[in-house]
Amino acid sequence: MKRAELDVVVLSEDLPNEGLVKGTLGTIVMVFNSPTTGYLVEFCDEKGKTIAMPVLFPAQLKRYFTIRNLKSLMVEGNYPVADPVDPDVMADLMHKVAPVEWEDKKRRVYEDIQRLLISRPDYADMFNIMDGGEYNGMTLYSLVQAENGEPAWSNIFVRNFDTRINEIYVDPNLIGKVVIGEESMSVIVYSFTDDRFEIRDKVSSDYVIESHTHFNGLLSALIEPVS
């Protein structure tokens, strides 16, 4: 896809000399077409101050996707699109105390999911647009979707209860993290320790395939290979 000035892009590799890591968001400020295609890309810190402005080639960049872009792709591909979560239900899920009869481990999972929704509005905003979704082998877990009156298999509470409260095996690499989705060969998690969204190998979950500061950066990494 041809890129233009002011397009937001995602860095697809580490640039140690620039102090930039894979997944960092930048803005194209100039396009070069000769002798080969290249882009002058501005990267800023959280305060909007420029921290680097390298010239990059197309292979070093990925397209930038948002939840609305994903929803459009799902509609175009005839994938089912769940309704957004009702604002009142969302407020309850974010602030209501877990049932007192729950065991401590279950309460901790519930509270971690609440903490994620509160502390990362970039992620929580997805549920104002659609309640999770499945697209070409990728699943983002839902909050309230149900099947025959029971939470769907992709319910984020169900998936995390299964991951962290399991009599057979509890993956030590996922303790203290919230699993927010999966692909065929990977799990998608949020790490409170690093305050980052991660794509981890499903079999060897100690291996972090990619790590992203922003949820939309994570989306861009997940969607571009399959879009």
Q: Where do the model's predicted regions map?
A:
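Local beta-strand/beta-hairpin segments that build beta-sheet-rich folds
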Residues: 51, 180, 208-212
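Basic/aromatic-rich interaction segments and small domains that mediate binding to polyanionic partners
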Residues: 3-62
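Compact, glycine/acidic-enriched structural inserts
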Residues: 201, 205-226
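Short, surface-exposed secondary-structure junctions/capping segments
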Residues: 64-68, 222-227
